[in-house]
């Protein structure tokens, strides 16, 4: 499990980036959020990392 904060979030498009505690940025799509959570820039999250078309991506994103 990885931890970080929402660095950028585009509510209209449903995507953004998580700044991981490891210093890397991870692309995140609304489809990779745990069901029912609402996010905004600056909140802390936990997530798994997968290798997608855009490089490393966050999945199973949930609030902490």
Label every model-predicted segment.
Residues 3, 25-27, 44:
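Well-ordered beta-strand positions in beta-sheet-rich domains
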Residues 34-46:
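Short nucleic-acid-contacting surface segments enriched for D/E, G, S/T with interspersed K/R
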Residues 24-37:
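Beta-strand/loop nucleic-acid-binding surfaces
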Residues 4, 42, 58:
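Residue-level signature of catalytic and energy-coupling elements of molecular machines
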Residues 1-10:
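Structural detector for short beta-strands of small beta-barrel domains
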Residues 50-64:
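OB-fold/S1-family single-stranded nucleic acid-binding modules
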Residues 13-18:
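Short aromatic-glycine-enriched beta-strand elements
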